[in-house]
Structures are given as C-alpha cells and as structure tokens.
Regions:
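Targeting-peptide/extracellular-domain and disordered-appendage signature
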Residues: 1-130
Length: 130
C-alpha cells in the first residue's frame, strides 16, 4: 500500500458545550499538513473525561482539503481515540467514498505520533474504485 508521511500543526478551540452535562466537551479542529500531504484540515471533536486522571475519549470528523502526492481533492477522516490511565489508542480512518476530484476512491488509515512536541502523520492508503 502507498504511504504518505509528514508533519502537521493543529489548533483546537473550545466550542459551546452542552450545558449541564459534566465531563463532555466540544472543540473545533484546524490543521495544516506538510510533506507528502499538503493540505488543511477542519473539523469538530467531541471529548469525554472522567474523574480518573488520564482516562478520556474523543471522536472527531475532519475534512482534509489539498493535495496528496500531487493529486488534488478532499476527503474525510474519522478519529476514535481512547486513553486508559495514560495508555492511549487511536484509530483514524478515511471515510469510504469521501474522496473528491483526483482523490476519488481514496481509502486508508492515518496514524499520528508526537515527538518533542511536534506532530507527525503516516497515511497508508489505496486510490481507485474498490
């Protein structure tokens, strides 16, 4: 499977929360991807925290618009993250059939790592009808 790698910057901003629902939050996502994916990402994240330190979860939907190895278009990522007392897992999937223009038929997954405060992505994908 082809891969695309690079780094990104992310800005999260709180949005209006559901009044009266303790432990839940909502944020906007704004990203700038660099490397083999040159794009912007915009979306929303829902979070849930617990009274136990470092235990939480989030889901997010993000539209990515730009170019993937020179192919222009957009696609949608679905994030599902969970942290259990500091041990985390994250699954980020390209929503099937969300690719547009030259990214029509894009499918795959993205992983994220943070090193020295900097964010990196690794996108594994296929392109074409399935």
């Amino acid at each position: 499977m082809p891969r695309a790698t690079g780094n990104f910057e992310v800005t999260l901003n709180p949005l209006d929360n559901n009044p009266g629902i303790e432990g839940l939050g909502r944020m906007s996502i704004d990203k700038q991807y660099h490397g083999e994916l040159e794009a912007t990402g915009q979306g929303q994240m829902l979070t849930g925290g617990t009274t136990i330190k470092n235990s939480a979860g989030y889901v997010a939907i993000e539209r990515v618009t730009g170019s993937l190895k020179g192919r222009k278009g957009s696609f949608i990522l679905q994030h599902n993250g969970i942290m259990t007392r500091g041990t985390g897992s994250l699954v980020i999937t390209i929503i099937p059939d969300s690719g547009t223009d030259q990214l029509d038929g894009l499918r795959g997954t993205m992983s994220i790592r943070i090193e020295g405060g900097k964010h990196f992505y690794d996108l594994t994908y296929t392109l074409g009808t399935a």
